[in-house]
Amino acid sequence: MSKAAKKKSSKKRSGSEAAQFDQKTIQEFKEAFGIMDQNKDGIIDKSDLKDLYASMGQIAPDSQIDAMIKEASGPINFTVFLTLFGERLTGTDPEATIIGAFAMFDKKDCGKIKEDDLIKILQNKRGEPLDEDEVKAMYKGKPPIEGGEVDYKAFAHLITTGAQDELASA
């Protein structure tokens, strides 16, 4: 198969990624897209990503944002967004997905984020925020927080293995 045929073939496959998700998952992607589309124009662009990082108290370098934008072949509407994430999530487990999300806030690339950042993420009004009682319940379970830093890999493991019940009921 020629390089051009392979390229064309792989592009064809990527469009079917959306078909692999159930309605609940697609709704979750819509909510995530809505959070990222800060100006609500139906397209995620550089300014949306900058605003998203700023809302989380982060400053992302232009090079990092440009790299994110370049992953798409054109404007990032919901269909493109779903396809990009579909390609990434195929064969991945929820724990790896959550770790990847937390890693965006790991400035030092050390496997930890600030406890304050975790609370901001969990209480972000643009998604499905946890209320004060839910945050208090999380702390009763003794999440992996030490010295004001969260081991987000251990935290992701807890919430994806059913241990969140232990967190809430401890």
UniProtKB/Swiss-Prot annotation:
State one molecular function term (GO).
Answer: calcium ion binding
- Would I find NADP among this entry's keywords? no
Regions of compositional bias (Basic residues) in chain numbering: 1-13
Decide whether keyword Transit peptide is in the record. Answer: no
| Domain EF-hand stretches | 24-59, 93-128
CDD domains the record matches: EFh
Gene Ontology CC terms? cytoplasm; muscle myosin complex; myosin II complex
Kindly give the InterPro entries that the UniProt entry links to this protein: EF-hand-dom_pair, EF_Hand_1_Ca_BS, EF_hand_dom, Myosin_RLC
Q: Which PROSITE patterns match?
A: EF_HAND_1, EF_HAND_2
Residues bound to Ca(2+) are: D37, N39, D41, D48
Question: Biological process GO terms, please?
Answer: locomotion; muscle organ development; nematode larval development; regulation of muscle contraction
Tree of life domain: Eukaryota
Note down the stretches annotated as region Disordered. Answer: 1-22
Pfam entry (one): EF-hand_6
| Miscellaneous notes | This chain binds calcium.
Per UniProt, subunit arrangement is: Myosin is a hexamer of 2 heavy chains and 4 light chains (two regulatory light chains and two essential light chains).
Q: What is this protein called?
A: Myosin regulatory light chain 1
Origin organism of this chain?
Caenorhabditis elegans
